[in-house]
From Swiss-Prot:
The gene is hutH. This is Histidine ammonia-lyase. The keyword Cytoplasm applies. Pathway: Amino-acid degradation; L-histidine degradation into L-glutamate; N-formimidoyl-L-glutamate from L-histidine: step 1/3. The modification 2,3-didehydroalanine (Ser) is found at S144. Transmembrane segments: none annotated. GO terms for cellular component: cytoplasm. The keyword Transcription does not apply. It catalyses: L-histidine = trans-urocanate + NH4(+). It comes from Vibrio parahaemolyticus serotype O3:K6 (strain RIMD 2210633).
Amino acid sequence: MLNLTLKPGHISLNELRQVSRSPVNLTLDPEAIPGIEESTQVVDRVIAEDRTVYGINTGFGLLANTRIAPEDLETLQRSIVLSHAAGIGKFMSDETVRLMMVLKINSLARGFSGIRLKVINMLIDLVNAQVYPCVPQKGSVGASGDLAPLAHMSTVLLGEGQARHNGQIVSGYEALKIAGLEPITLAPKEGLALLNGTQASTAFALEGLFIAEDLFASATVCGAMSVEAALGSRRPFDPRIHRVRGHRSTMDAAMAYRHLLDTSSEIGESHTNCEKVQDPYSLRCQPQVMGACLQQIRNSAEVLQVEANSVSDNPLVFAEDNDIISGGNFHAEPVAMAADNLALAIAEIGSLSERRMALLIDSALSKLPPFLVDNGGVNSGFMIAQVTSAALASENKTLAHPASVDSLPTSANQEDHVSMATFAARRLKEMGENTRGILAVEYLSAAQGLDFRAPNKSSERIEIAKQMLREKVSFYDKDRYFAPDIEQANTLLKLALHNALMPENLLPSVH
């Protein structure tokens, strides 16, 4: 379990990666408390002075011009939570909800939302008790924030809705009891502060980022294995080639291949003086393609780290100036575009892997037995595994279509341009699963090809990667039930063990 002292606005990508993968024991930095309390005092003054301020004593959306009577303010905040909990579909995973909640706490605790410390502490207590609200995956367009998902999260604070604890679904009231809490009555501004924000979209996008990083590492390892299995040249990874083009991420990708292939390879030495002049693009252009993918991963990581530490509420409370300002920080366009770029990277990583695997089973190109099996004809070998890879790669081409270019007006045209960030980010998990499946097939194929090169061995790191697989899946000597082999390789890739074989500090959240 991760023990995390939250300094609002300063959470790292590596910490968020850990939050997304395992339970967390969260503590709020005491230095954040004065700012939180000062922002609530500004809201209290608005009520005391009978001023009209959006979100505090008005309606919402197109109803923003409707003034709410003082005796209805508590009802207003409860009503917005219950009415906006209108999501649909399967529930988010506990991991996604936990990440979303930590992001929400991080944002609220910065002291610009006018929400009491008591409410923030309730969210912290739920996270620490591993009580995760049941939040439907669908129902947000990423502006005005992720209203429906965050409303479902917030219903539990009222003793409403549902939550999961240890895999069991319980009522919101029971969920509070498990965490040692009682239902709360929200004060003015608090319901809106809980609901406004990009935390659902950002949680999905961060998960997509971490998946993309793991896939990048596995694809680089599998790609290096395929170079060796196909008796490919190391010369395309020469740093001089990439230095004259100048793209930092391409130079780093080439360095990663050199790191894996090393110079001490019996397989590499066995064909130093061969007649082959150039390898096909799927081998030779790996640094250029994977470098471009790495650049998209890094660009997206930069955007998402900022967003993870941002205040995306509306209106915002500036206690120093005794001012409350309405704006549009809830609009998740940066998240949507970051997610779209991650989608491109995930799709291309898979597309290139499928082409490498297709090369390996083609004996004319790889000089390996047809379909990577002896006694071809009787045995079909890896023939249909490549078809599976092709199917997954083609699915990702459709899923990679940018979501951020879409928009559909909501709230009677008051909210007339939206980001579609939630879908842009949510589909990344499915795309990642597809690409992991493609890589699983390449992993099996490359290991098979390397075994055909025996007794010659590859570099130390590539032999380690091959041995990881061989401990789970044996050499394919004749046709057998293939699906379990793919599943074993897939499960191994999901553990992200290949990250340890990569150069340090290559990927933004991996340390």
